[in-house]
């Protein structure tokens, strides 16, 4: 399966169904009155996090997703059915960003987590809502409210406990294959790994996930090589395993290059706990191993462990140290409260069902001087002094202007 870790898509929730204008027609009932039902709500756009996906490739060839419109109302006070939802299935670790990639709208980190991204539009009122003592046969019915729409970015950040970093050909994929059942591509040339790979390490009765990303080179944060695009996949890691190729002449410089790229990327990668290992020790003499371990320890300021992914030397001590950091990080993490299952981009021009109902009642009020209705930030005026219907929404500034005008009229 091809790997894709980001995709731009267009989503639209369904429009509300139209209200119905109808009248009761039955034998021996001369004046049945209105019985038009309301339209149904439009379908929602829902994100669902599933465990059996590890790529966003499904969104490469289809970028537009639209929920269904709500069903129209019918006679006999029948409310239209809700439109079908659009359910977008994404891998664990998917983030939702706005079109400019500046704001994270949602972060799905556990399988089974769902989130309503866009709500469907409300259905229109049927003529039953307009019945009053003075208008017993209204012929007015509303269209449904439009749904919401927007462009969004989906960005995948894999969920792993430990992340492998290092220069190309440092032996990261070989190490992953040696400690897990993952089978990444392994070859003797740079950038063999072109996308992240995950593997599960079993250590006694404990398990943790380790991620292998493409190698970094000097200037990766400026786009050199594959760049630092895949560093986002280790942002969630609790510890980093930094592998250094022991066959290089200057192992200290190799360490500093990668550390510089981690710091330049940001995201707190350079502040994460780190385990440093000198890899490919099977190709070195005992004196060379001792000398390079000393040079590397001075550069990183901590003990460096010898390792050979091919022969298996040093694997258990490294895994034990990684799990020690992982266990400490797990214990230190605060309990995360359950995320709200509902997320939506609110529309300022779309009042709630109760607000709309109050507005309709205000419009039918027979008060000669007009009637003001207020609910939170919504303020409506139903009729002007001539009794003509006015359908306007006012905010706080508009209300202050109206009050000032009334004071001026009173002074005159």
From Swiss-Prot:
Name of the top EC class for this enzyme: hydrolase
Binding sites annotated in the UniProt record for Mg(2+): 173, 193
GO CC annotation: cytoplasm
InterPro entries attached to this UniProt entry: G_OBG, GTP-bd, GTP-bd_Obg/CgtA, GTP1-OBG_CS, GTP1_OBG_dom, GTP1_OBG_dom_sf, OBG_GTPase, P-loop_NTPase
OBG-type G domain location: 160-327
Annotated binding of GTP, by residue: 166-173, 191-195, 212-215, 279-282, 308-310
Cofactor(s) needed for function: Mg(2+)
Presence of the UniProt keyword Membrane in the record: no
Biased composition range(s): Acidic residues: 385-412
Segments for region (Disordered): 335-412
Record-annotated Obg domain positions: 1-159
Entry's Gene Ontology molecular function annotations: GTP binding; GTPase activity; magnesium ion binding
Domain of life: Bacteria
Keywords of this entry: Cytoplasm, GTP-binding, Hydrolase, Magnesium, Metal-binding, Nucleotide-binding
Matching SUPFAM superfamilies: Obg GTP-binding protein N-terminal domain, P-loop containing nucleoside triphosphate hydrolases
Protein family per UniProt: Belongs to the TRAFAC class OBG-HflX-like GTPase superfamily. OBG GTPase family.
Stated role: An essential GTPase which binds GTP, GDP and possibly (p)ppGpp with moderate affinity, with high nucleotide exchange rates and a fairly low GTP hydrolysis rate. Plays a role in control of the cell cycle, stress response, ribosome biogenesis and in those bacteria that undergo differentiation, in morphogenesis control.
Oligomer and partners: Monomer.
Protein name, per record: GTPase Obg
Biological source species: Paramagnetospirillum magneticum (strain ATCC 700264 / AMB-1)
Gene this chain is encoded by: obg
């Amino acid at each position: 399966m091809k790997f894709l870790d980001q995709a731009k898509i267009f989503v639209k929730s369904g429009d509300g169904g139209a209200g119905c204008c109808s009248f009761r027609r039955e034998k021996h009932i001369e004046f049945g009155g209105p019985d038009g039902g309301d339209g149904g709500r439009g379908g929602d756009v829902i994100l669902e996090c599933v465990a059996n996906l590890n790529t966003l490739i499904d969104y490469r060839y289809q970028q537009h997703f639209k929920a269904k419109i709500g069903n129209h109302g019918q006679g006999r006070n029948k409310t239209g059915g809700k439109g079908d939802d659009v359910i977008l299935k994404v891998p664990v670790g998917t983030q939702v960003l706005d079109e400019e990639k500046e704001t994270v709208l949602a972060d799905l980190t556990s399988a089974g987590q769902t989130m309503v991204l866009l709500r469907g539009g409300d259905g229109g009122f049927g003529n039953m809502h307009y019945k009053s003592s003075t208008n017993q046969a209204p012929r007015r019915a509303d269209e449904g409210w439009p749904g919401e729409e927007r462009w969004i970015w989906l960005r995948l950040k894999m969920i792993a406990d430990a992340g492998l970093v290092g220069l190309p050909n440092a032996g990261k994929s070989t190490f992953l294959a040696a400690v897990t059942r993952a089978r990444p591509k392994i070859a003797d040339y740079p950038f063999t790994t072109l996308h992240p790979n995950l593997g599960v390490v079993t250590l006694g009765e404990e398990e943790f996930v380790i991620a292998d990303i493409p190698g970094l080179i000097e200037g990766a944060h400026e786009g050199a090589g594959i760049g630092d695009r895949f560093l986002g996949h280790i942002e969630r890691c609790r510890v980093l395993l930094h592998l250094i190729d022991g066959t290089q002449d200057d192992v200290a410089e190799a360490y500093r290059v990668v550390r510089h790229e981690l710091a330049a990327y940001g995201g707190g990668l350079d502040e994460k706990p780190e385990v440093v290992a000198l890899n490919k020790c099977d190709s070195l003499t005992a004196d060379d191993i001792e000398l390079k371990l000393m040079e590397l320890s001075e550069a990183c300021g901590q003990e460096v462990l010898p390792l050979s992914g091919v022969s298996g030397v040093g694997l258990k001590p490294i895994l034990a140290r990684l799990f020690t950091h992982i266990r400490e990080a797990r214990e230190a993490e605060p309990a995360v409260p359950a995320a709200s299952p509902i997320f939506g981009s609110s529309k300022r021009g779309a009042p709630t069902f109760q607000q709309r109902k109050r507005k309709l009642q205000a419009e039918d009020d027979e008060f000669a001087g007009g009637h003001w209705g207020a609910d939170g930030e919504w303020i409506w005026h139903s009729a002007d002094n001539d009794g003509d219907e006015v359908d306007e929404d006012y905010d706080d500034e508009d209300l202050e202007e109206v009050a000032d005008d009334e004071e001026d009229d009173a002074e005159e």
